[in-house]
């Protein structure tokens, strides 16, 4: 959940590192630091706080053409300058940055480093001290680095500088994302291609347990035992301008507004020249052959999976289970004879999901990944991949990836139904085009939604979202958005569950937002609204055109009943955005969170 960047070349290292870290700040922002190497040695600058603070502290007079940087989300040790990366060995010859969690760091300390004094609370310092200890034994940095990597258990993406070798960055990874960016007379290392898009669009994948020697003019990939690995580079499908806010005050608002564009992009990508659905034949076969689908996801992706379950069961007549990734390995259900696992992850790097993928691959079961990042770990390791085509999502709170996931799941469900020969009165591409138009109408109603956010969330500490059927899943996502960025305690409930306990929490002025977009439950959810109003709640009803009543606070345009989450979630996202804005919260980088959860 941290971000690392490295550079070796001819240009000003400091600016490249700082700019790269700014692009990676969504991965963590508890603390940050850089280390640069020149003829006078290694220069380390670390701060508690964000990259802007680091910029202020960096000595701009120090010239260097080689360095590493890190932005941290704390796992071992509190956020502090002492625990911030880069970390150095006792002699200061070796300097390291690390993303991940070393599970056996205490064992290594006891077995190899009993005589070493540590200055931080991190597992990362153990790695760099181990490398120094092994270098004393071998007098060879690559050998020491390789053996150290072989001793580590857990997840890591590592960049190392040897103060006595200005020609090589030493790099390795296991279960954590890391790429090498390729340039002319320079090369880079980064957790995410977004960090280095201004320098290059050519990248080399690094696989687990590989050692990479990065020089100015070459990159050599080796196995842990020194065998050279040949690998072709790939071109990143991201434009650098897509990672900028432009005229928007926040990435989140920009990404909310981009959702109509994303819907049209998905239509384009999943439509053939005849206007029919276009999917990989292997995916079609896998879906048709499956007797049960197991959706594995976390957070917002899990909420999208709940909507996807309804699509697949209603349209394709295949039973579906949706599981929280972090719990699945502990409580694996009895699997069907022909299961297909569907992993949903914006980043394609979610550690909990990857752990499940590794487990089910060992069992020989097929896997399909829905991800926004081509070439990501889940995409690479699953049997099949469907891309979301949402473009880079920078804000920590997911918006456009959520709606992209739902749209792609709808396409997958309809295509599977047709492959199975089932009759459907539902054309997803045409209906998604209608959704895109509805989204544009909704994103133009910001002033109205901003006022509603002031009225309902201005001073509250708690809020409840209720819905029935599909609206219940949107209520869960709406609550997550509000709590993520405004720090209001919010929960999403099934309307029918209110009387089974939750209604005890309703008191005078408690905001309750009720969603009603399904005709068959409209009467019931309005009954729930009356129940909470009778107990003092400040109720807001958000309804769909055709189901509205005069007292409703907000009405969304009519869309197909299967796709209502794509429309009803837009006002929920904007309510959360304005609630956070008016409470002076950091919308794009909420406290204690990171966008890409790459540790379990």
UniProtKB/Swiss-Prot annotation:
A GO MF label: carbohydrate derivative binding
EC number: 2.6.1.16
InterPro entries named among the record's database cross-references: GATase_2_dom (IPR017932), GFAT (IPR005855), GFAT_N (IPR047084), GlmS/AgaS_SIS (IPR035466), GlmS/FrlB_SIS (IPR035490), Ntn_hydrolases_N (IPR029055), SIS_dom (IPR001347), SIS_dom_sf (IPR046348)
Localisation per UniProt entry: Cytoplasm
Example GO BP: fructose 6-phosphate metabolic process
Biological role stated in the UniProt entry: Catalyzes the first step in hexosamine metabolism, converting fructose-6P into glucosamine-6P using glutamine as a nitrogen source.
Keywords (A to Z) from UniProt: Aminotransferase, Cytoplasm, Glutamine amidotransferase, Repeat, Transferase
Disulfides per UniProt: none
CDD domains per record: GFAT, SIS_GlmS_GlmD_1, SIS_GlmS_GlmD_2
Domain named Glutamine amidotransferase type-2: residues: 2-217
Catalytic residues of the enzyme: 2 (nucleophile), 595 (for fru-6p isomerization activity)
Assembly and oligomerization: Homodimer.
Xref: PANTHER family: GLUCOSAMINE--FRUCTOSE-6-PHOSPHATE AMINOTRANSFERASE, ISOMERIZING, GLUTAMINE--FRUCTOSE-6-PHOSPHATE TRANSAMINASE (ISOMERIZING)
Residues covered by the SIS domain: 283-422, 452-590
Pfam families (alphabetical): GATase_6, SIS
Domain of life: Bacteria
Main location: cytoplasm
GO CC annotation terms, alphabetical: cytosol
Protein name according to UniProt: Glutamine--fructose-6-phosphate aminotransferase [isomerizing]
Catalytically driven reaction(s): D-fructose 6-phosphate + L-glutamine = D-glucosamine 6-phosphate + L-glutamate
